[in-house]
Amino acid sequence: MLISQRPTLSEEVLTDSRSQFVIEPLEPGFGYTLGNSLRRTLLSSIPGAAVTSIRIDGVLHEFTTVPGVKEDVTDIILNLKALVVSSEEDEPVTMYLRKQGPGEVTAGDIVPPAGVTVHNPNMRIATLNDKGKLEVELVVERGRGYVPAVQNRASGAEIGRIPVDSIYSPVLKVTYKVDATRVEQRTDFDKLILDVETKNSITPRDALASAGKTLVELFGLARELNVEAEGIEIGPSPAEADHIASFALPIDDLDLTVRSYNCLKREGVHTVGELVSRTESDLLDIRNFGQKSIDEVKVKLHQLGLSLKDSPPSFDPSEVAGYDVATGTWSTEGAYDDQDYAETEQL
């Protein structure tokens, strides 16, 4: 460190899942260097656990319903994605849910094996009527970041096994700011203020400690340049860290036109993560989903720094016919007539 006074780290616990950390004093400029590194590592590289696939008794695919259950299978899957779990096992483990109606089915009805904990037992999964019965087998695995359902689809899986989007990251949100602080007569040193919010499966303190350990191991490669570093496994790159939260967003947040929104929902695309795993060809196969819908989706994803699976990195929204980049609006020629679309749907 370039200053004689050793930096200190203090924690202010705001809630059980949110803390604010202060690191000071830091040499001018090091606040942003350290803050950005910690933030990206916290969002992308903290290991966690998530449901990767499910199997519902009597169900062959997600586009159906379960007798006696208010929610359809797609809604049940969306609810299960919000399940907060932790696992001490490196291998996949299986949990079971069996409930007879009437009443609500919650995460507390899940029976986890030893080493697995469900941290939000009050979360609602489904609602059963008098004759309703729900039996679900859930596979939980450990991992990092976000993995779309298409990558969780195992070859040779039995009929009825439904892959699920997995959001492994136990960190929900990380923000930081850098203020000035005083050291003796100088007032231009940095004070890093880091705000960390996590799921109930890990404390912000443990998450920050894990991020720090990861960075120390990585920076050790530069410190020990006399050691051959080629081939060392350093884990996934944090370059896509900022996208993890976006993957979990529902497509409702994209503010799409009625045409595009209804087509995607009907196809079973409910989140941004599910959308970016599709190609343009996949979307064009959807009924009523044409090139204008493709352009609209690409523009909306570009605003989040994302793109469709096969979109070229050079995509420029200003080249889309009818779209005004300056105002973020569509001209009459490029816009959709949702009224006409609604009338067409009724026909």
UniProtKB/Swiss-Prot annotation:
One Gene Ontology term, aspect cellular component: DNA-directed RNA polymerase complex
Gene3D superfamilies: 5' to 3' exonuclease, C-terminal subdomain (1.10.150.20), DNA-directed RNA polymerase, insert domain (2.170.120.12), RNA polymerase, RBP11-like subunit (3.30.1360.10)
SUPFAM superfamilies, alphabetized: C-terminal domain of RNA polymerase alpha subunit, Insert subdomain of RNA polymerase alpha subunit, RBP11-like subunits of RNA polymerase
Catalysis: reaction(s): RNA(n) + a ribonucleoside 5'-triphosphate = RNA(n+1) + diphosphate
Pfam family, one: RNA_pol_A_bac
Gene Ontology molecular function terms on file: DNA binding; DNA-directed RNA polymerase activity; protein dimerization activity
Keywords assigned: DNA-directed RNA polymerase, Nucleotidyltransferase, Transcription, Transferase
Chain positions covered by the region annotation Alpha N-terminal domain (alpha-NTD): 1-226
CDD domains for this protein: RNAP_alpha_NTD (cd06928)
Region (Alpha C-terminal domain (alpha-CTD)) location: 241-347
Enzyme class name: transferase
GO biological process terms, semicolon-separated: DNA-templated transcription
SMART domains for this protein: RPOLD
The keyword Nucleotidyltransferase appears for this protein: yes
Keyword Transmembrane: no
Annotated EC: 2.7.7.6
Family under the similarity heading: Belongs to the RNA polymerase alpha chain family.
Subunit annotation: Homodimer. The RNAP catalytic core consists of 2 alpha, 1 beta, 1 beta' and 1 omega subunit. When a sigma factor is associated with the core the holoenzyme is formed, which can initiate transcription.
Domain notes: The N-terminal domain is essential for RNAP assembly and basal transcription, whereas the C-terminal domain is involved in interaction with transcriptional regulators and with upstream promoter elements.
Physiological role: DNA-dependent RNA polymerase catalyzes the transcription of DNA into RNA using the four ribonucleoside triphosphates as substrates.
Protein name (Swiss-Prot/TrEMBL): DNA-directed RNA polymerase subunit alpha
Name of the coding gene: rpoA
